[in-house]
Amino acid sequence: EDNSVNEIIDLEKSLDTISGFFKLSKILKKKNFDRVYIFNGSLRYNLIAKHAGIKSIFQYPLFTSKDIIFQTAKIFTENSIGEIVDTQPSIKSDKKKSDMIFDKNYKHIILGLSASGETKRWGVNNFVKVTNKVSREYKCKFYLAGGSSDQKIIDEFISKSESKNFFSFTNLNIKEIISIIKYADLYLGNDTGFMHISSALGVRCIGIFIDSPAYAYSGYTKNIEAIIPRGETINSTTHNTNGRDKISSDDVIKKVLEYIIS
């Protein structure tokens, strides 16, 4: 829990409508906010804030789009509060250890097999090739990061893998997941929320970017190394790159072994 967050207002779908404009404005007005920070270039939110009677409105330039999200946020925040801010995130978890036992003779690796869309997934067979090779050379335990909707992907991976030393996150809540991730040696996987959580917990991450903005989603932290499609750069790899077939399992295996050795 974060004591600096007093309340979260859920921007549910109904608030996107015309009536939702006035509903959200009414909600904000009741809070008697004296200032608002809007981390996008939305004219709608600007007008809602004004309609709610908020006097001091800090916002990105209107209609800002296709920006490097962490850079824009950093510049905006520094200009708004007059202080230098660090883009390196940090999740502070309680000191209670996980109920699981982390054998130091093993390498504990978080696997991000899924992603928010099919084109962002490197593919189960590729991960099987990597984990089979790595587990032949080192004693490894793999933690399968995913929710209940990812069960089919996780089951496919387990059925095809040589190693059977797995633990799935599908039945855990976020606090339980964090208590495990923070003791991991490495995250390997697609561009997922689990990658960003791992990074914020100080875990080294190998992120496979095949169809999402590699620099925008990895450049904010020292903990994520982006693997990008052959022929692309970290800046050119973005939405619609469709680079699944341009990242070889051999290249990823080499990178994972480098991390394990170091």
Question: Model-found features: residue ranges?
Answer:
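Catalytic machinery of carbohydrate-active enzymes
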Residues: E1-S262
